[in-house]
Amino acid sequence: MKIVLIPNLTRKEAAGVTAGICQSLKKLGADFCFTDEYRNEFEHTGAAFLPENEALDGCDAVIAVGGDGSIIHAAKLAAVRHKPILGVNAGRLAFMAGLEDNELHLLSRLIEGDYTLDKRLMLKMNIKRGNEIIGSDYCVNDCLITNEEKQRMTAIDVSLNSSRFNSYLCDGVLISTPTGSTAYSLSAGGPVVDPELESILLTPLCPHSLVDRSLIFRPDAVLTVESAEGNTLCISSDGVQPLTIESGCYAEVSRAEFTANFIRIKSDNFIDILYKKLAQRR
């Protein structure tokens, strides 16, 4: 088995956890590598170092080390190549982690193929001018649409399958996957949705209304979002650098053509993980 490691070295624990993973993989006889940018930090591990595309295209699995943000970033790189990913927690909650840093002995199950794949729905967002796509991205958790001037409310029109659905006066709207229902969506008052229930969630942020609530749509829904006032909006995918939706343009959000495939080595289910992780916040 060929494995690519993608650690987030801004996490103080990540370097040590990654070194431990390297030791475990070496003992198990697995081939593992990093992308070239990690050469200085991990040259002593005996790993190979390759350009990003070569490493990811040629691997059998990806191991991401860090918190949820790091794992989600790596999951997108893996998903577009139809590669499975295992998250190892070196952050705080890390809902997406399949292993904690004290469970590296379980990596033997990965090498032996003793695991299941947890296939998670992803979203694709296109920024369009008419029928022309002028920008696009994918997300594992959510995409956030706000006014370009973040401190101001904005009027946002939302259409469902090409039919005008609602207009929100709010700070923004959040479109989430079931995976993202335990992230920003949860903080914004959205429902927790089991990831096995494929669906798309829409949550208005601080709506100036007595009735606006989160909504759950079927997985083949296509949501179109644009400014009701001709203002410039911003849309960001999983919290990364936002793209601009200029006046006369709109964002179209729908199910992606592939899934994020998370490796599950342990037998804990969604409710087990939810209770364990959120109990840490009490």
Please report, for each region that a protein language model flagged, where it lies by residue.
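Catalytic core of DAGKc-family lipid kinases
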Residues: 92-171
